[in-house]
Regions:
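N-terminal Rossmann-like NAD(P) cofactor-binding subdomain of oxidoreductases
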Residues: 1-144
Length: 145
């Protein structure tokens, strides 16, 4: 069985930890990279002891070179951060942003609601904000969710 190679950016926050718990129990997922900025070199179990028994990589600083080995990127980062990662996506990469970077389909709306300029305008057309349970066929056509 082919496993999806996954990278989690923002792995040490609450959302990142909960996501890692779910992914580490999924038989079709291989977590290749756990990324963070302030906890480089630490084990994820430092932040949540329930992950001690899981075979997971240590936390590393995100590097765009990782993308060539990754199928799926989850970002559990503050608003604005997934936009930067999206600029470097390869055709095979799918980005699932757990923040608000690609919720709105117009850069002007993003500025209005989030009080910051959208820095990946050209990627908005490649994104969809949808519930998988209601939009599975639509979601398959996009590489930013």
């Amino acid at each position: 069985m082919h496993k999806l190679n996954v990278l989690v950016a923002g792995s040490t926050g609450y959302i990142g930890i909960q996501l890692i718990k779910l992914l580490s129990n999924h038989k079709s997922v291989l977590i290749k990279y756990l990324c963070g900025n302030t906890s480089i070199g630490k084990k994820i179990s430092y932040f949540d002891k329930s992950l001690e028994t899981k075979k997971l990589p240590n936390i590393v600083k995100f590097n765009i070179s990782f993308l060539k080995n990754i199928d799926l990127i989850f970002t559990a980062l503050p608003n604005g951060k997934a936009q930067e990662i999206s600029k470097h996506l390869l055709k095979k990469n799918v980005l699932i942003d757990l923040a608000a970077d690609f919720r709105l389909q117009k850069a002007q709306s993003y500025l209005k609601w989030y009080k910051q300029k959208h820095r990946a305008n050209s990627k908005i057309k490649d994104s969809i904000y949808a519930l998988p349970e209601l939009s599975e066929n639509k979601i398959k056509k996009f590489n930013i969710i």
